[in-house]
Amino acid sequence: ISATVWQNWGPNTANTWRQVPELAGGGFLFDTGAHMLNTVVDLAGEGFAEVAAWLDNQGRPVETLGVVMGRLQSGAWVTMHACGETIPSCASDVRVFGDRAILRTGIWGERLEIQRYGRGHLRKVSVSASLGVWEQFLAVRRGEMPNPCPPEVGLRMAALYDAIRASSEDGGRPVRVQPEEAS
């Protein structure tokens, strides 16, 4: 899995609560980047075994740049890149590379494309229209549909973010994620 998110987050959030560590809890990777972390963890369907990360504040009170490399419990590799210091924009690209196909999506699910083995390019995948966040929440609550993102995904994301912070604070040293934290 390879994921990238970019936005002119640093300049846009200067002098706001988003760049006050005690209020925000983190910077770009914890804000817009959290959508990337959640998407990757959800697509992976399993926890991380090991993570190495580097975060850079670019002179700001919180991080605005980040690079993450990780290995899933199955051994599959993951790379993530977060750039909050770029031209006015907010976009992403997430790819899952398999031996039979490549999937492409975004961190907000704004597209789904597939390139199958033997095909020359990505093709759009038709999906049902979204119910909308609140309608979907209510349908799950009423038992009309399964939760599309159960709590375990959030727990795996929290374990990933903790490992990213720990690795970055130790100069990018790889950090092992405990199985109970990752699953």
Regions found by a protein language model. Name each.
Residues 1-54, 59-60, 171:
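Predominantly a Rossmann-like dinucleotide-binding segment in NAD(P)-dependent oxidoreductases
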Residues 37-111, 132-147, 163, 176-183:
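Contiguous beta-strand/loop segments that form the cofactor/metal-binding neighborhood of enzyme cores
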Residues 3-5, 82, 125, 179:
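Active-site donor-binding loop signature of nucleotide-sugar glycosyltransferases
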Residues 154-168:
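C-terminal hydrophobic helical "lid"/dimerization subdomain
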Residues 123-135:
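Active-site loop of classical SDR/Rossmann-like NAD(P)-dependent oxidoreductases
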Residues 2-7, 102-105, 113:
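Mobile, glycine-enriched helix-loop/loop "lid" segments at the mouths of ligand-binding/catalytic clefts
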Residues 122-125, 140-157, 172-174:
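Glycine- and charged-residue-rich phosphate/anionic-cofactor binding loop of Rossmann-like
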Residues 88-93, 114-119, 123-125:
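A short, polar/proline- and glycine-enriched secondary-structure boundary/capping micro-motif
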